[in-house]
Amino acid sequence: MFDFSLEAIVYAKAISLLATVAVVMMWLFYYCYRLKQKNEVIFGTHHAAYIAYSVCIIAWISSNAYFHTDLLPELGASAGMFMAKFANLASFFAFAFAYYFSCQLAAEQRKGKVHRWQQGIFVSLTVYSLFINLRPGLTVEHVDIVGPSQFIIEFGPHTSYFFIGLVSFVVLTLVNLVAMRTNSSKLTLAKTNYMIAGILVFMLSTAVIHLGMTYFMGDFSLTWLPPALSISEMLFVGYALLTSRFYSVKYIAYLALSVLLVCAIFVLPLGAIFIPLTESNQWLIAIPICALIGITWQLLYKKTSRYASFLIYGDKKTPVQQILSLEEDFKLSIDDAMRRLGKLLQIPNDKLRLVTSNYNETFYEEYLSSNRSVLVFDELSEELEYKVSAKRSMKALYDKMSSNNTALVMPLFGQGKSVTHLLISPHKSNNQMFSNEEISAVQTLLTRVQSTIEADRRIRQSRALANSIAHEMRNPLAQVQLQFEALKQHIENHAPVEQITLDIENGQAAIQRGRQLIDIILREVSDSSPEHEPIAMTSIHKAVDQAVSHYGFENEKIIERIRLPQHTDFVAKLNETLFNFVIFNLIRNAIYYFDSYPDSQIEISTKTGPYENTLIFRDTGPGIDETISHKIFDDFFSYQKSGGSGLGLGYCQRVMRSFGGRIECKSKLGTFTEFHLYFPVVPNAPKADTLRTPYFNDWKQNKRSNEHKVAPNVQINNQSPTVLIVDDKEVQRALVQMYLNQLGVNSLQANNGENAVEVFKANHVDLILMDVQMPVMNGFDASQRIKELSPQTPIVALSGESGERELDMINKLMDGRLEKPTTLNALRHVLGNWLNKNTASSACEAERE
């Protein structure tokens, strides 16, 4: 009677095969669990074929394990013949279902069904295989048994045809997978590469050993190896089916080579010691050897992996290690570290961006959850292609990333798991996908440097505050200085009291404008959340009128270029103070270009809808390039505007979100810019008329009454030298013009660099006072062009710039520098230096002529 005990299977080959069975079974259970989690359909899809293939692999490995146990000699030749035929059928059906699995995949890719001829091949070969293996003597005639792992199978006459059928399935499977690569996406290519790799390892090992060594050479000692290697196909194919993120070929080769090198270090010396020992002594020394391997593995792996990296990548550090080593670089300079990171990821120059999550978070936050911590464009493409249910929810995200040429969005989570920053990357320059090891390495790196990034953000915030206040305050200070000069002249000329009072009021208005600018800037850089501010229902017309009436305009000419909403009022729930600052920001951005674009205007209008109402703020200035329009709500982003904090529009977005709405930008370069402020419809709201007050309708008249034009038109004196004043701010030009009048010098004005070149060509100019930062054309470019026309004409920078680069450019392109706002004495000194030199130079040239 047969007596089974564990000792019957305690053989290295049998244990290896049974361990493989355990791994495959666990993988199969996990695979089915993931399908259930994802609510995937199994029957009628490639999943059913893959599961059937996996079951056949388990049966095949188990039947092969039988031949390497004591069960083989104990049960005899008849049981051996049965298990040999069972192994034949298990391996055949594994190959057959692998083939049908590839047919099903190809059919799903083309959105069709498996071809009839493919089904015919599957059925016909299956019937034939069952026939020749179930009928005695056709594939296996006899099994000669010596002991475990020591046996010879005598094949029947149909064995060669049986193996031809297996080879046919291998070839047809590879043909299907290779055909799937044609006109496929990058993600589909990666999936098929993984599947082909797994199938090749398994099927080639089977073909070489089962066909070559057993059938032709009669050696059955290695028949256990193909079943053990079948795990490669299981894992590679299953991984490709379950995931959309893959490790690169080089990284897999690096890991494999590192492990092989460590194994070689252990096997060669330890094998020389272990093999000569008797079987009883081998077990005694096995335990300390295992302990030695466990203790030293990590150290040896760390050492040998450097050489593996050098062989694979040509560098002792892998790209993953190089990415993680950027941690110290981030502490020195985030911008430089981001450039190096972009280079390692093969991103085009300076296209990799780390932005705060003001605008983008509102769009991406619903997708950036714990189960989707990274948004990858290629993965979205696959979901839209294969999952009909995902199309509605994912289409908008796909279109957004596609329009912005975005390939990767990775969040940084702060306290409370809220998104603080977003790493946004375009597609790689080599058009490859982001590999799994790259994404994991970048995630780890950003987690490590998050505190550094947050500290840098606060430092930038402080710098932006200081820079913005310093820049913005120059204009109101110049206005105050201008009013003091005018007041001084009026007192000396014994002007009436009314005129002196008006000068004082104008000076006070300039001071108030300065205070307002400081309040706006402090609001921009504040970390306080607008969500906690109280909100109330109000008429949008009233809110706009009130905000505009409180804005500190420099002169009445600006007021004349603003059109307020006249029709379609609606009720909005908002905080008036916060809303005022939103309007202030939009007005300030628009009027910045008024001097350079004299025909530009501001038009504010409204539009109602069933779910949300819209306030449209339109200016017909320079417009915004479409390629950067999506960046304008990012913190510290400034476009064609010097001295700004780059925080204003991000603040506007936060405020609008606190109202339950949002702000969006629509622009056409060179034509217009529109900001659409969306407010949710207020249910059961009273009529807007009842919330409106007529008080603010006369805001233009109130503003005009306090405006006074200080600088009169100047008559050109042909006997006096002429100075060209170039500045985009009228108040700065007016102040310099007043000083030049007092010094008896003629003046011409230009509001940007391009205008300055035109004025210079049309008039005789002895000296140019040139601002640096201006729209349309800056002072550096204008100076370069003017110097090409007239190298002798002195150009003095009229600027408050203090940056190292700007000062270096001033020294290279200009002849001197005046602080802005300037003073009478400073201007007199410059005129004394340059006008005398220039007059002498002109006289010498005239004498030569």
UniProtKB/Swiss-Prot annotation:
Reactions mediated catalytically: ATP + protein L-histidine = ADP + protein N-phospho-L-histidine
GO cellular component: plasma membrane
Phosphohistidine sites (modified residues): 471
UniProt-recorded Gene Ontology molecular function terms: ATP binding; phosphoprotein phosphatase activity; phosphorelay sensor kinase activity
PANTHER family: HYBRID SIGNAL TRANSDUCTION HISTIDINE KINASE C, TWO-COMPONENT HISTIDINE KINASE
Annotated organism of origin: Vibrio harveyi
Domain Response regulatory: 722-835
Keywords annotated in UniProt: ATP-binding, Cell inner membrane, Cell membrane, Hydrolase, Kinase, Membrane, Nucleotide-binding, Phosphoprotein, Protein phosphatase, Transferase, Transmembrane, Transmembrane helix, Two-component regulatory system
Membrane topology reported for the UniProt record: Multi-pass membrane protein
Domain of life: Bacteria
Protein name (record): Autoinducer 1 sensor kinase/phosphatase LuxN
Compartments in which it is found: Cell inner membrane
Residue numbers carrying 4-aspartylphosphate: 771
Predominant localisation class: membrane
Boundaries of every Histidine kinase domain copy: 468-683
Residue ranges crossing the lipid bilayer per the database entry: 9-29, 41-61, 160-180, 196-216, 220-242, 251-275, 283-301
Functional description taken from the UniProt entry: At low cell density, in the absence of AI-1 (autoinducer 1), LuxN has a kinase activity and autophosphorylates on His-471. The phosphoryl group is then transferred on Asp-771 of the response regulator domain. The phosphoryl group is transferred to LuxU, and ultimately to LuxO. At high cell density, in the presence of AI-1, the kinase activity is inactivated, and the response regulator domain has a phosphatase activity. LuxN phosphatase acts on itself.
